Amino acid sequence: MGNTTIPTQSYRAMESGQSKSYIIPFALLCSLFFLWAVANNLNDILLPQFQQAFTLTNFQAGLIQSAFYFGYFIIPIPAGMLMKKFSYKAGILTGLFLYACGAALFWPAAEVMNYTLFLIGLFIIAAGLGCLETAANPFVTVLGPESGGHFRLNLAQTFNSFGAIIAVVFGQSLILSNVPHQPQEVLDKMTPEQLSAWKHSLVLSVQTPYMIIVAIVLLVALLIVCTRFPSLQSDDHSDSAQSTFFASLTRLMRIRHWRWAVLAQFCYLGAQTACWSYLIRYAIEEIPGMTAGFAANYLTATMVCFFIGRFTGTWLIRRFAPHNVLAIYAFIAMLLCLLSAFSGGHVGLLALTLCSAFMSIQYPTIFSLGIKHLGQDTKYGSSFIVMTIIGGGIVTPVMGFVSDAAGNIPTAELVPALCFAIIFIFARFRSQAATN
């Protein structure tokens, strides 16, 4: 089908003189990007902590990520319906409420040492984050002149990258360092009472960090309640602006660039999760004498590369066509994955680490390109794009399967390389559409 657009009224601010009133709302929206990065990246801290505290198998520990993926996957459509009926602001406040409730559940869960209760809390947090992403990503895009939408979203996502780094430091200092992990020989010498007390102390170490998060989330929610956001025509609830979910979906399915964006975002989130999930194992397998503790430094380095890449990418998008920048970044990421697949060793590990710099701008750029010209269907359109986070839960095990079949990790890097190739095709398609 052709690249269909929907003739609707402008999706921008209703009053041209409101540009100055965007500053405070935009700053608050940027804080949301920071907040959901903190919650997402703390999962990597919780996983080893809970695995020791609850004596979990790898599968049971993996339920932490499953709870997140499932929460993210099911909430965007209800969130889109909520915003369709009310406003972006209502979606944001709902997301912050769920975020705070889920984080608050960590206190009683730690007191009673109940892993299931933690998973419920994580699911509620993820539902809140899914709601925030569904609202904040398109809101940032439409909050101002259309020409600056790509730049604003990439700038806001820079705070997301910063939040990821802060989460690792925050988690290491307040969770991992609070109660030192003990080697198995030390644990074997403990009495049952001592072992139980030590395990409980591991779980209790999450209480203070998550209560700090609750306080910050509630403070941001209060600031948003007290802040007047610019009036957007997308929040007009007249009958002419309303449409049912299925009618909206029918229109969306006719829009070629939106369909491609959904596929590209699925591939991106799958590639990102897979690359980061297997980075430490890649280092241990390919570098003789490499320990898991030292290999974790490479994961930290990927976060720094990701932040630098997003910062410089945001500058590039301000000066060049976003789809062209996306095409270049996706192509380089693909080449680096291929290099890590065929070279191995220090060269492959370095390539995999640097790859994060070129992942950086892909999510926000795919998102903003995907929702462009969707008009009244933007809220549902963005909901489906947010749902593609399930790609992380599908591509990662596929990469694991390839690794098991090949007998090594490097060969499995062909999987994210294929994902980046699809993103490159999407970017080139958007480039051709822009020139026609």
Model-derived features: where do they sit?
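Cytosolic juxtamembrane N-terminal segment immediately preceding the first transmembrane helix
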Residues: 1-32, 36, 52
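Extracytoplasmic
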Residues: 24-52, 136-137, 275-283
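Extracytoplasmic gate region of multi-pass secondary transporters
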Residues: 43-47, 167-168, 172-178, 251-300
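Central cavity-lining transmembrane alpha-helices of secondary-active solute carriers
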Residues: 63-81, 300-312
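Helix-to-loop junctions at the C-terminal end of transmembrane segments
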Residues: 75-88, 309-321, 403-404
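C-terminal ends and interior cores of transmembrane alpha-helices
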Residues: 97-112, 331-344
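Hydrophobic core of transmembrane alpha-helices in multi-pass small-molecule transporters
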Residues: 115-132, 347-361
